[in-house]
């Protein structure tokens, strides 16, 4: 929304931003941007815009841990009536805590538990709660194969059950997981423009022409993304498909016996590999 339209829109509530420990740096950047953007806005001085312009929208909140490794969420200021946004990076493994004298790096499960603790401290007080989770927790476990748990669906239902109104993520592994919470807001933002912009900026000699470049999907799961990028760039698309031995099961999966390539000749071309998710080594 442009700044000239702000006077026609009443804020849902006083803005509050809670970047969890995993997202402190990006949270500060978001806060600085909003402070600058709002200071330039021409809004009236009515009661609807009270506290609209402030020096910071970040709410003082922490998740300290006990010696046992357990934790609790603490708000050091009121969030009553606020429109609260929580930022969390469940893949930030740089954070660590001590349990019985041993150092443990935080896993996605740890980050998700801290998120729920903070929501529990907020629920019933904030006017609206929105979770911004760039990497959707448990997104790779979006469907059931045999006797498996549906972790991503359960995680989304947990969040909405304890008071979350909106969930925002980026390029969800499978956006259809939002069917788990059909009556709640779930947004998966596609950063296609940012991806292409970064590619052209960091690889200045790349040429988006069919004779110079090709998009390749490593498997069928990423084919939709590869086709989209190929159409945007105006280049050819290729893919691999996995031949599996369905007579055996190794580590819970049918083993791959070969990768077959389907596509045009890649000789002399710049190849951009588009995958839906890049796990260690496997793809």
Task: Please provide the spans of the model-predicted regions.
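PRPP-associated nucleotide enzymes
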Residues: 1-283
């Amino acid at each position: 929304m442009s700044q000239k339209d702000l006077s026609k829109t009443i804020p849902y509530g006083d803005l509050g931003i809670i970047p969890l420990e995993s997202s402190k740096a990006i949270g500060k950047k978001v806060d600085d941007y909003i402070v600058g953007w709002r200071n330039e806005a021409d809004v009236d001085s009515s009661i609807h815009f009270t506290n609209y312009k402030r020096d910071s929208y970040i709410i003082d909140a922490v998740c300290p841990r006990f010696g046992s490794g357990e934790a609790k969420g603490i708000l050091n200021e009121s969030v009553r009536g606020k429109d609260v946004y929580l930022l969390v990076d469940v893949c930030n493994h740089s954070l660590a805590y001590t349990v019985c004298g041993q150092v443990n790096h935080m896993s996605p499960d740890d980050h998700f538990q801290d998120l729920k603790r903070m929501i529990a401290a907020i629920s019933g007080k904030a006017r609206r709660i929105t979770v911004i989770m760039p990497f959707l927790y448990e997104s790779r476990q979006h469907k059931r194969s045999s006797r498996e748990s549906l972790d991503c669906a359960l995680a989304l239902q947990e969040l909405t059950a304890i008071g979350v109104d909106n969930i925002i993520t980026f390029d969800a592994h499978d956006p259809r997981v939002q069917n788990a919470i059909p009556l709640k807001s779930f947004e998966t933002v596609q950063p296609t423009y940012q991806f292409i912009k970064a590619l052209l900026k960091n690889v200045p000699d790349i040429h988006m022409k069919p004779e110079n470049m090709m998009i390749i999907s490593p498997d069928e799961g990423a084919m939709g993304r590869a086709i989209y990028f190929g159409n945007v760039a105006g280049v050819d698309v290729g893919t691999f498909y996995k031949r599996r031995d369905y007579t055996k099961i190794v580590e819970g999966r049918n083993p791959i016996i070969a990768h077959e390539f389907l596509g045009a000749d890649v000789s002399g071309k710049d190849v951009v590999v588009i995958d839906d998710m890049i796990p260690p080594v496997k793809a």
